[in-house]
């Protein structure tokens, strides 16, 4: 695999976000707490696949990504992010199998590299 981008990732499926308790919304605003997520690992982007390894091992063909979205929605609201999303927003992938993945890539307490990954995915998907 010839990686275009690599990084560390926190992620959740849409159903996991919708099933979270109210403590997750409150806990997100404490210093030193990582953003809400159910899974963690490493992520790599090649010219035809997205690879996630960690507590799950996923290989997502880029052809199966129906939509990418950078921002908040009803499943991942601003209340889940410290400073209500001033410094970063989640990256959502809508897949052809009906799953929606919410990614937080290279989080460092101040921000994340989601914009870089959004731009990279957008470029590959438009080619």
Indicate where each model-derived feature is located.
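Intrinsically disordered, low-complexity boundary segments flanking structured domains
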Residues: 1, 56-57, 89-91
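Phosphoinositide-binding peripheral membrane targeting modules
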Residues: 35-86
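Anionic N-terminal interaction surfaces
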Residues: 1-44, 99, 117, 124-127
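Acidic, Ser/Thr- and proline-rich intrinsically disordered linker/docking segments
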Residues: 64-127
């Amino acid at each position: 695999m010839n990686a275009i981008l690599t990084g560390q990732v926190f992620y959740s499926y849409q159903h996991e976000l919708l099933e979270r308790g109210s403590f997750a919304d409150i806990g997100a605003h404490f210093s030193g707490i990582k953003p809400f997520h159910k899974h963690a690992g490493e992520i790599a982007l090649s010219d035809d696949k997205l690879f996630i390894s960690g507590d799950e091992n996923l290989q997502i063909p880029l052809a199966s990504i129906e939509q990418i979205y950078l921002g908040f929605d009803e499943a991942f609201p601003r209340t889940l992010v410290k400073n209500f999303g001033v410094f970063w927003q989640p990256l959502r992938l809508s897949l052809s199998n009906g799953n929606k993945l919410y990614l937080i890539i290279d989080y460092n307490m101040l921000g994340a590299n989601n914009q870089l990954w959004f731009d990279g995915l957008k470029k590959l998907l438009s080619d």
